Amino acid sequence: MNTNTRVTLLLGAGLLLAAPSPAAAQYFGRNSVQYETFHFKVLKTQHFDVYYYEKETEAAAQAARMAERWYARISNVLRHQLTGRQPLILYADHPDFEQTNVLGSSPGEGTGGVTESLKRRIILPMGASLWETDHVIGHELIHAFQYDITGVGRSNMGAGLNRIPLWFIEGMAEYLSIGPVDPNTTMWMRDAVRRGELPKFQELVSPRYFPYRWGQAFWAYMGGVYGDDIVGALLRSAGRTGNVQGALEVMTHRPVDSIVAEWHRSLVESTEPVALATGVVLPTDRTQVQQAREMPVTTAGARLLVGPGRVLHYNIAPALSADG
């Protein structure tokens, strides 16, 4: 799932491997509060050991089929077979998931899934819909492939993995699990084009640019131009050296600034028809860019969810009522 909590766990666990003290690895889950006792069973498939308990028996069988389907897709794109069997630990709901003792701490409420590096275990709760569960399984399995390809958890751990930026790692997981067309990411890109805030390559690591959305958009461009074979090739190269820019330039035979400039151009070109249809003027020079950045939100339209006098209120995931 797209949460900063899971990102920290993803990379933080990898960094623990190089730490001098093994305490964090030895005492996984010692501070997790457990209100229930889960009696896990194991469902074995061709590539997975799926851990589940009684009340999620039927859902676990569905998740196992999803996982095998994702394995076939990802292994084909990345040209890689995982070393050994892949553990997949399922919880029936999020409150159960928060009691897991697999991790060093309890996952937060916004965490949709975790892939830890020490044993390459995927841990996740069943989602509110089959689509959500399917997406999270795919996203987390891609992280398992990233670990395996770069050697995390083994003695030959890729020396540069801890220097690979989040937009590269999480963007790849989003691109391969959602695809190149995503309304959510498209919304982010259109807004950035409208405000003239397309980042330079070096700025992609800034917290200002959410790694999931910007990373997915960049990978969608790379896959569209160079084909998906470049995804695994870039991962292997960057994993060996920790130098994403160098890997990009070697694989494409082009300077990274040229790649990013064409990516920006493609974002603008894809936004122009929508801007024309909605009467939005896209900025074309520095003055217009600055004006767009300073544009108050109210000029874009009337407030629909927060009225006058309620400036301290906010809405999370609002939805239209079916009955009006």
Where are the predicted features?
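Short coil/turn segments at secondary-structure boundaries
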Residues: T150-V152, M189, T278-G279
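Bacterial N-terminal signal peptides that target proteins for export
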Residues: M1-L10
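N-terminal signal peptide c-region/cleavage motif recognized by signal peptidases
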Residues: A18-P20
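Beta/coil-rich, acidic/histidine-enriched accessory regions frequently appended to metallopeptidases
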Residues: Y27-K44, S206-F210, A233-G324
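Active-site-proximal alpha-helical
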Residues: V50, I74, W167-P183, R190-D257
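Juxtacatalytic substrate-recognition/specificity segment
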Residues: A25-P165, D182-N184, Q202-L204, V244-A247
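Cleavable N-terminal signal peptides
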Residues: G12-A13, P22-A23, S177
